[in-house]
Amino acid sequence: MPELPEVETTLRGLSPHLVGQRIHGVILRRPDLRWPIPEQIERLLPGATITNVRRRAKYLLIDTDAGGSALLHLGMSGSLRVLPGDTLPRAHDHVDISLQNGRVLRFNDPRRFGCLLWQSDIQAHELLAALGPEPLSEAFTGDYLHALAYGRRAPVKTFLMDQAVVVGVGNIYAAESLHCAGISPLREAGKVSLDRYRRLAAAVKDILSYAIRRGGTTLRDFISPDGAPGYFEQELTVYGREGEPCKQCGRVLKHAMIGQRATVWCGSCQR
């Protein structure tokens, strides 16, 4: 599933091609993705101008002058690309938003776990209202994590992946950040010290920022809007490396399921 760096990479690739463009038309090749596509998409988008494209957590928000915003999620396998308007659709190209400049924003989603929704007051949308802070914002600190973790017995990895705690830190980057900070993913969230949470918050920021610069992580499905893969996969220290040696100490990496997610860590470097 695309995580925050992949969605941010998509945003940065799309934004220059979309902001200021007038929408010519919308083609829906199916009426639903994960949820039904609301009728406002076909009714309100044609003729509207895109005023901004931004990200909240793993959602892309396309603001318009039509009194609302389109909310998109890439799901497990979705991708968004801006293409010449005469590009023939392929399998799983479910949505086309054609632009006045002759190009088309195309949403491809083989597994249909993505979504395309509409909201007049986008920050009030139920998918966004209860989200925690952005991990790259000033609000996300070790002190914040330590205070919120007080008394919690869930594993720290589960805590870090809770979208009400902090948004956009999925399985890949939670595992990598915990390894960087030297914290076992099995440790109870409420038993991690303030100093270690400060190291963890710094690790999350550093790793996400670096992953964005590297274009995200290509694991099976993610391709950036220009068709290029993400290169952070080449930098992974623990994720997907069960049974291999730790890059820091050489010990064999451990593997377990935590919160129904495959988790890899170093029993020597992470305590």
UniProtKB/Swiss-Prot annotation:
GO terms for biological process: base-excision repair. The keyword Membrane does not apply. It comes from the Bacteria. GO terms for molecular function: 8-oxo-7,8-dihydroguanine DNA N-glycosylase activity; class I DNA-(apurinic or apyrimidinic site) endonuclease activity; damaged DNA binding; zinc ion binding. The active site is at P2 (schiff-base intermediate with dna), E3 (proton donor), K58 (proton donor), R261 (proton donor). Involved in base excision repair of DNA damaged by oxidation or by mutagenic agents. Acts as a DNA glycosylase that recognizes and removes damaged bases. Has a preference for oxidized purines, such as 7,8-dihydro-8-oxoguanine (8-oxoG). Has AP (apurinic/apyrimidinic) lyase activity and introduces nicks in the DNA strand. Cleaves the DNA backbone by beta-delta elimination to generate a single-strand break at the site of the removed base with both 3'- and 5'-phosphates. A zinc finger (FPG-type) spans 237-271. Belongs to the FPG family. It catalyses: Hydrolysis of DNA containing ring-opened 7-methylguanine residues, releasing 2,6-diamino-4-hydroxy-5-(N-methyl)formamidopyrimidine; 2'-deoxyribonucleotide-(2'-deoxyribose 5'-phosphate)-2'-deoxyribonucleotide-DNA = a 3'-end 2'-deoxyribonucleotide-(2,3-dehydro-2,3-deoxyribose 5'-phosphate)-DNA + a 5'-end 5'-phospho-2'-deoxyribonucleoside-DNA + H(+). Binds 1 zinc ion per subunit. This is Formamidopyrimidine-DNA glycosylase. Monomer. Its EC number is 3.2.2.23, 4.2.99.18. Keywords: DNA damage, DNA repair, DNA-binding, Glycosidase, Hydrolase, Lyase, Metal-binding, Multifunctional enzyme, Zinc, Zinc-finger. The keyword DNA repair applies. It comes from Xanthomonas oryzae pv. oryzae (strain KACC10331 / KXO85). Its cofactor is Zn(2+). DNA binds at H92, R111, R152.
